[in-house]
Curated annotation (Swiss-Prot):
Catalyzes the stereospecific hydrolysis of the cyclic amide bond of D-hydantoin derivatives with an aromatic side chains at the 5'-position. Has no activity on dihydropyrimidines. The physiological function is unknown. A divalent metal cation 2 binds at K151, H182, H239. Carboxylation allows a single lysine to coordinate two divalent metal cations. Keywords: Hydrolase, Metal-binding. A divalent metal cation 1 binds at H59, H61, K151, D313. This is D-phenylhydantoinase. Substrate binds at Y156, S286, N335. Its cofactor is a divalent metal cation.
Amino acid sequence: MRVLIKNGTVVNADGQAKQDLLIESGIVRQLGNNISPQLPYEEIDATGCYVFPGGVDVHTHFNIDVGIARSCDDFFTGTRAAACGGTTTIIDHMGFGPNGCRLRHQLEVYRGYAAHKAVIDYSFHGVIQHINHAILDEIPMMVEEGLSSFKLYLTYQYKLNDDEVLQALRRLHESGALTTVHPENDAAIASKRAEFIAAGLTAPRYHALSRPLECEAEAIARMINLAQIAGNAPLYIVHLSNGLGLDYLRLARANHQPVWVETCPQYLLLDERSYDTEDGMKFILSPPLRNIREQDKLWCGISDGAIDVVATDHCTFSMAQRLQISKGDFSRCPNGLPGVENRMQLLFSSGVMTGRITPERFVELTSAMPARLFGLWPQKGLLAPGSDGDVVIIDPRQSQQIQHRHLHDNADYSPWEGFTCQGAIVRTLSRGETIFCDGTFTGKAGRGRFLRRKPFVPPVL
């Protein structure tokens, strides 16, 4: 199968050019002008459009069981939504397994979840929910099998203490893996939450007040220092929501420490006022939404390069689930927002089309740096001969209003309802196959492939 994309502006992280792009047997074969492929081939006219590498979302939670509920997107509906939003690769954060389980247990479970459902290519982050000799011995074997990143939690049921974190950081570093972390100070949060509950203050706004930005920033600073103690172990901070944490990361970078950070569209475009609306419960997530001042600080990090990745933390619970389980109490509400379908369009509209970032920086944030950090480069995140033919075509001339009824996830609402975006995703190709075109999903369940990722190699800071 050959596909020729003509007359578009092809953009990579290091530059752009108006040229044609030829994909053959799922692989990019040629870029240039006046390409004349062997017949037969499909021709796609991208006049006036940007031709970007397909998005790489390195933070999703599909089919996750959080104890009180299971998310309503599985690996079909979740990856279908991703495809319709221009994302062609996801790396899913696996949920916790049974108490005391081995690392391999969750990998086998999640490969079963995805095998016959995923529309796009996928991988997983390991999750370390306890530390013992067996777990530490298992890490190098998992890296050899293609899992080169693992997540630690400083909050929730399976939070690790500082000694366990140090052991994990050392072994992951030795094994060629990148440590990712959910950083929040669990003890401080528990104290604040207990105060509010005792006072009968359980409305959605108290979710944010119980998890102040200092709880997140303190945990970020602690992880930075622990990573240094562990032999300058590489560290990746997930879902950054505030400027103080970013200041700590800037300081670590200035000291040449190998740290990277992601943020998410919700922290760039939504704010804490959402908790005071009639539907405030739909915005319960952790870390919570912050104020507009924190948004501005994050946008500075997006613009000046301090933030490396924009992912989604897509973790969808329906409003029916939220209301039935929480009964109006924020502390009982399952956490998470949908967003995997909207990430690329939201960042293009609010970043590229406003002049905050260049098209090249858009690629760096949404595909190139995620692929480099997580062992997928140059197969993913790049349009060059030999790379996978993963493409998203965006038309900057089109304006669209986000409406849930047009989305493809399994939620019953969108936090972005009514947002007007300048720029529309008109086509998504995965390994040369069109899986979304002009508003219509054309992919199929089970076509996605499991990606064995390479050991971690730090990009140049």
